[in-house]
From Swiss-Prot:
Gene that this polypeptide is encoded by: RIBC1
Region (Disordered) location: 1-21
Record-linked PANTHER family: RIB43A-LIKE WITH COILED-COILS PROTEIN 1, RIB43A-RELATED
BP term (GO), one: flagellated sperm motility
Name this protein carries in UniProt: RIB43A-like with coiled-coils protein 1
Record key words, sorted: Cell projection, Cilium, Coiled coil, Cytoplasm, Cytoskeleton, Flagellum
UniProt main location, coarse: cytoplasm
Length: 379
């Protein structure tokens, strides 16, 4: 008997301890802010965090490749701008040298190439401009004469020859510059194509590295998740086996009502072991219900008697109230008759007083002449 009780106490203590541990774990899950998992899928959140990290790593690698390409493009643009500035500088230098060598003031012409008749329009150099009104005897040039025609023609031919040579030189220089620009453009295009090919290879290698890293991360994450699921499954199986063992060996499945009796407090029961009330308890409850029923019936009879008394008192009060109202109506009628006779007497007295005033006091009525004597002057 002692051994059986000892085993029962041990099982009960173990069950109580297990229940207390489960309650502590549940409180930790609910009340611990850092590890609260109520209503939250921790696995899904971890997956989202991993996906976000992979996406951020891919974006960082893409931004690094884009930054490298941008730097290379900037270098190429700077080279082109520098080449354009050098070419502009050389052209400006050549123009300045041409102006300094070929367009000096000492080499200027006295006539315009586009106005050959300038000599005809001008005056001879030996003509004095001091004489304001020259006469016919001062004529020095007549129609049909052109003393400097041969010189002027030679000068025009020389000017034409010079202009033609200069145009040929400019065309040759423009052709040379165009060839240089085409060569530079071809070199730049080849350099940009090579750079684009290099950047494409870099991007492809970055993409391959990113895909490899993503595949490795997915494999590692899948392995971790599989291990976690396996551990969770094993823990759940152990918990189920322990629960089955506990249910099969505990007092929960027994039909003995004594297992619900509390050992330290006899007036209390164990809710998880309670199998129902005993016949004595049911009889005591029925007896108590019968006592309550009799008390309720006595209370109902007392309320009924009280209601009857209240009704009779109400009826007597209503009868007395009706009698008082009848007396009040009679008194009001007597008062109205007395008030009417008094008002009639007062009206007769007032009429007699008014007749006396009209016939005796107010006999001398003022005429229009009496009223016209007032306000007849400005004073």
């Amino acid at each position: 008997m002692y051994n059986i009780n000892q085993s029962t106490d041990t099982k009960e203590a173990a069950a109580i301890e297990a229940r207390r541990n489960r309650e502590k774990e549940r409180q930790n899950r609910f009340f611990n802010v850092r590890n609260r998992v109520m209503g939250v899928d921790v696995q899904a959140l971890n997956n989202q965090v991993g996906d976000r990290k992979l996406r951020e790593a891919a974006e960082r690698s893409k931004e690094a490749a884009y930054g490298t390409s941008q730097v290379q493009y900037d270098v190429v643009v700077q080279m082109l701008e520098k080449e354009e500035a050098d070419r502009t500088r050389r052209l400006a230098k050549k123009v300045q040298e041409f102006r300094e060598q070929k367009q000096q003031l000492k080499n200027g012409r006295e006539f315009s190439l586009w106005d050959p008749d300038q000599v005809w329009k001008g005056l001879p150099t030996y003509l004095s401009y001091s004489n304001t009104y020259p006469g016919p005897a001062s004529l020095q040039y007549f129609s049909g004469e052109d003393l400097d025609r041969a010189t002027r023609l030679r000068m025009q031919q020389g000017q034409f020859r010079y202009n033609l040579e200069r145009q040929q030189q400019e065309q040759q220089q423009a052709k040379v510059d165009e060839n240089c620009a085409d060569a530079l453009s071809n070199q730049l295009r080849l350099a940009m194509d090579a750079q684009a090919t290099h950047l494409a290879r870099l991007e492809e290698s970055c993409r391959a590295a990113m895909m490899c890293a993503m595949a490795n991360a997915n494999k590692a994450q899948a392995a971790v998740q599989a291990g976690r699921q396996r551990c969770e499954r094993q823990r759940e199986q152990k918990a189920n086996l322990a629960e089955i063992r506990h249910q099969s060996t505990s007092d929960l499945l027994t039909e003995n009502p004594q297992v619900a009796q509390h050992r330290t407090a006899p007036h209390r029961v164990l809710p998880y072991c309670w199998k129902g009330m005993t016949p004595e308890q049911r009889a005591a409850i029925r007896k108590e219900q019968e006592v309550q029923r009799s008390k309720k019936e006595a209370h109902r009879q007392a309320e009924k008697t009280l209601d009857t008394e209240w009704k009779s008192q109400t009826m007597s009060s209503a009868q007395a109230l009706l009698e008082l109202e009848e007396q009040e109506r009679e008194l009001c009628a007597v008062f109205q008759r007395g008030l009417g006779s008094f008002n009639q007497q007062l009206a007769n007295e007032q009429k007699a007083q008014q007749d006396y005033l009209n016939s005796v006091i107010y006999t001398n009525q003022p005429t229009a002449q009496y009223h016209r004597q007032f306000n007849t002057s400005s004073r």
